Amino acid sequence: MEKIPRWLLFSLISSVLCILGALCVPLLSVAFDSKRNSQSKLVNYGLSLSAGSMITTSLYMLLPRIEKSNRFKVFPGLLLGICLSFFLNYLVHAFASESLVHCADSGDHATGSHIHSKSHSHSHSHSHADSHSNFSNDHDLENAPSEHGYATSSSSVSENDPLITKDSDRPQMKKKMSLIDLLTRRKSEGECCDLNKCTPLLQSEQPEYIACVPPVIKSSQSERNVPHGCEGSEDNGQSDDKDHRGLVCVENNIGYDLENLSLYRKNFLSSRHHHSSESPENYGSNQLSHSFSSPLGNDVTENPAALADTQYHPENGSLYPHHHHLETPFSKLLSIGMQTCLVLALHKFPEGFIIFYTNRSDSSKSLGFSIFLSLTIHNFVEGFAMTLPFYTVFESKWVAILITAVLGGGSQPLGALIGYFIFKGSTPRDHEPNMDFLLSVTAGFLLVIGLQMFQTGIGFSDGHHHHQGEGDEEMKQSHSSGTTCLKWCCTGVLLILASALFT
């Protein structure tokens, strides 16, 4: 049997190490499974470890040194990689984000999405949540003012009556679709707005502005309990100081609600099915029952009858229902996982190429072996980083392992094989490759992913939940902090720098 070429052997060993790194994720998951809520630690600290390794890999190992000969390749390539990463991140969130409806109102009575949410958890700030938080009540709906242009008595409205009456005097709803709406073909209520366009009443002296819904909910159990909204006040900012209570920012409260990841995943899958089966002729009815997830992860559907309170006010035609697209833990991890697998797979092609090029002759034997040793730890950590986001976000865990095995385990040998066919029959000094631009693009891509991982790990960690009735030991086991995420990030940096000792 002919001896296996050194470059092929090194490539196969690197692939096996990548797959072993991927298998560490389910093993650690089983180890943490015996402790309640401790799997969130694996996600938070694992993302931080991967972030440190990726940031160091991008800036220290991949990014070429800027010299006079390549200065017009390195920086443009880095910039292109960063832009591509942001664009791909935007596309993923466009398809996987939650759509939240905000409804315009005068502020005289409860406004908002009319959500009926239930929660038995409270945030890390140790504020307890009411088990039944209603942002509007039946009394408000029954006594809604007649200026809305619809029946004011609940007895006069049956289930068969139209929710929106044909009133020629009522201004038409402004419909402005965003790029996200166009990409996903979603038919959401009103205009797509940025969260910053919801001007809080506490920061505005102009009464025509609408508070970011809902108003403050007063709870007998907590100092503050507002699971849904950004800022605002129940009394247009005129109540006493003791009634001025901050509102949890809905974007951060939803985006880092890792504990209820399964609900956001279920919401995403059900909404995909809903939008695919929706036809233009029944759009008028479907848009009034917009499904989304509450900030605390409860699966919520708007009450269609409550949307009678969202009509235009004749005195202010500029106010209209609108919606926001919010990132969720599902969309964040899905985006990170897709980008990580894509970039690391592309990154392993030049790695395999380099392994072949430095091991093709006896003269470069020592250099090729040192590069192989430096890539051992590197490949192990990369396998872990590729698997963790998908393993967390997918319901079928074996899919995450399979993706890493195919992309991570197969890309490096494939890159070495491509190098073999390119340089077959040439002398070692012929056709020396210049991959500065390709490495710069990959470095820019990897840099953004690493920063996203670190941001997400800290957000998940600082936004974790404690539960009523937990003992001191349970709270200690489920507790995680951003400071510990920083330590794990530094550990990832040291792992990559330690691998450079062999070069």
From Swiss-Prot:
Keyword flag Ligase: no
Ranges annotated as spanning the membrane: 8-28, 42-62, 75-95, 336-356, 371-391, 398-418, 438-458, 482-502
Membrane as UniProt keyword: yes
Molecular-function GO terms, alphabetical: zinc ion transmembrane transporter activity
InterPro entries listed in its UniProt record: ZIP
Compositionally biased intervals (Basic residues): 115-126
Disordered as annotated region, ranges: 112-171, 221-244, 274-295
Encoding gene per record: ZRT3
Species of origin: Saccharomyces cerevisiae (strain ATCC 204508 / S288c) (Baker's yeast)
Biased composition (Polar residues): 280-295
Residue list for modification Phosphoserine: 178, 188
Record's protein name: Zinc-regulated transporter 3
Protein family membership: Belongs to the ZIP transporter (TC 2.A.5) family.
Compartments where found: Vacuole membrane
Ranges of compositional bias, category Basic and acidic residues: 127-142
Role: Transports zinc from storage in the vacuole to the cytoplasm.
Annotated keywords: Ion transport, Membrane, Phosphoprotein, Transmembrane, Transmembrane helix, Transport, Vacuole, Zinc, Zinc transport
Membrane topology listed for this record: Multi-pass membrane protein
Protein origin, superkingdom: Eukaryota
GO biological process, one term: zinc ion transmembrane transport
Gene Ontology cellular-component terms listed: endoplasmic reticulum; fungal-type vacuole membrane
Name of a matching Pfam family: Zip
